[in-house]
């Protein structure tokens, strides 16, 4: 006579929480495994889903190119030529910044007339 999985699940469903905890501990001891290992492995996957570093990318400098160049110079500390080249290339303005800093930079550049994305 063998017990089916459904019989085991029904028996566990009728147990109290304390009985289930005791059953898990007994199974860990008998089979030399740990139920917490699966939970620990799932933890880093959740952390990977949340992005912590962002890139601020300019998609257009609009009609106010000079104002955008000034805003880029102020935000990055670049010289005039470097800031002008960066604005004209429509590339990444800043890489690997925190979300708050990225949002602030986006706001500053958009006020100057640029179109900006945070990636």
UniProtKB/Swiss-Prot annotation:
Coiled coil: none
Keyword annotations from UniProtKB, A to Z: Ribonucleoprotein, Ribosomal protein
Function: Forms part of the ribosomal stalk which helps the ribosome interact with GTP-bound translation factors. Is thus essential for accurate translation.
Underlying gene: rplL
Protein family (similarity comment): Belongs to the bacterial ribosomal protein bL12 family.
Organism of this sequence: Colwellia psychrerythraea (strain 34H / ATCC BAA-681) (Vibrio psychroerythus)
Ribosomal protein keyword on record: yes
Name this polypeptide is given: Large ribosomal subunit protein bL12
GO BP annotation list: translation
InterPro entries listed in its UniProt record: Ribosomal_bL12, Ribosomal_bL12_C, Ribosomal_bL12_C/ClpS-like, Ribosomal_bL12_oligo, Ribosomal_bL12_oligo_N_sf
Known partners and oligomeric status: Homodimer. Part of the ribosomal stalk of the 50S ribosomal subunit. Forms a multimeric L10(L12)X complex, where L10 forms an elongated spine to which 2 to 4 L12 dimers bind in a sequential fashion. Binds GTP-bound translation factors.
GO cellular component labels: cytosolic large ribosomal subunit
GO function terms (MF aspect): mRNA binding; structural constituent of ribosome
Key word Iron present: no
């Amino acid at each position: 006579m063998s017990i089916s999985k459904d019989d085991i699940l029904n028996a566990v469903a009728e147990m109290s929480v304390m009985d289930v905890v005791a059953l898990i501990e007994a199974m860990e001891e008998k089979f030399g495994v740990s139920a917490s290992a699966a939970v620990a492995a799932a933890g880093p996957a959740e952390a990977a889903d949340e992005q912590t570093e962002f890139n601020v990318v300019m998609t257009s400098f609009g009609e106010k190119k000079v104002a955008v160049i000034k805003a880029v110079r102020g935000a990055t500390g670049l010289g005039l030529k470097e800031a002008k080249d960066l604005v004209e290339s429509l590339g990444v303005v800043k890489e690997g910044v925190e979300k708050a800093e990225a949002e602030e930079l986006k706001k500053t550049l958009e006020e100057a007339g640029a179109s900006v994305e945070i990636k």
